[in-house]
Amino acid sequence: MKLGVCTWTFGPISLENTFERVSRLGFDGVELHGDLESFTPEYVLGLCQKHNLQVFSLTPGDCDPASPDASDREAADKYYRDLIDFAHAIGGARVSLHGLVGRIRPSAGSDHATEYGYLVEFLRPICAYAAERQVPLVFEVLNRYESHLINTGEQCRQLIKDVGSDQLKVLLDAYHMNIEEADPVKALAQTGQQLGLYHVADSNRGGIGQGHSALQPQFEQLAKMGYPGPIIIEAPAMGPDPFTPVKEGDYLTKLEHQLSLSVTALREQFAPATAI
């Protein structure tokens, strides 16, 4: 099982420094934050070669594909097309989509059904474009404290059905499932082959074993259903505000400690069986 980590959790250090740390910690690759103004595909490919890493996926910056404001949706359309082009240029990494983080209710004068309709209409041409560029898409299921649109695996599977494209799959995250799913293992099982990516963090958004989430049954379910990977750890340094990577003190040492524990736990969990 290949393991990755979200680059945004390393904060404002350079991408090269981030890749150095990721490689040293024993990861196979990264989920790259989609800040397209900060680096080129050629630069990223060079870092991958230098540090023997892959870019498994791209996570989007701030945009609102379900906004009642057409100009917001147009900006999101351009951004995601650029992100898909970037993913194509580096070899076809998955592109993650989700609603605008922090918008936890419909905009004034709007409602959930209307904005859901905007999202479906937005995704159809984006999926078609991604298919042309041979770039897989995953829609990340966020908890209700981050987004009002898609909060459960069931809702995401319905979204994919309404969009009508096999190019789009589900991204389930253990941290969000701990909040929204009555049974995360069941959510994984019901998603089945529609699972395109899996994120993990414990209940407190720390590393594996730092909270109270029952992660072991989820890992067993992933193995049972033949999920090929990767597993992406999205666990910033512990402290106030889980959306901000930089915490008081030496946040990078704190971050690397919990990532190291998580890598060890996952390597042990998914180690190949030894023949007797």
Predicted feature locations:
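Histidine-acidic metal/acid-base catalytic patches
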Residues: 1-2, 9-23, 38, 91-93, ...
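Active-site-proximal loop/turn and secondary-structure-junction residues that shape catalytic pockets
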Residues: 9-11, 34-36, 60-64, 99-103, ...
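N-terminal substrate-binding region of glycoside hydrolase catalytic domains
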Residues: 21-37, 59-62
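Residue-level detector of anion-binding/catalytic polar loops
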Residues: 28-29, 54, 93, 136, ...
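Conserved beta-strand positions in the central sheet of alpha/beta enzyme cores
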Residues: 31, 57, 96, 138, ...
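Active-site-adjacent beta->alpha loops and helix N-cap segments on the catalytic face
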Residues: 37-47
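Active-site acidic/histidine proton-transfer and metal-coordination neighborhood
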Residues: 49-50, 70-169, 252-261, 276
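The substrate-binding groove and active-site-proximal loops of carbohydrate-active enzymes
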Residues: 64-74, 113, 204-209
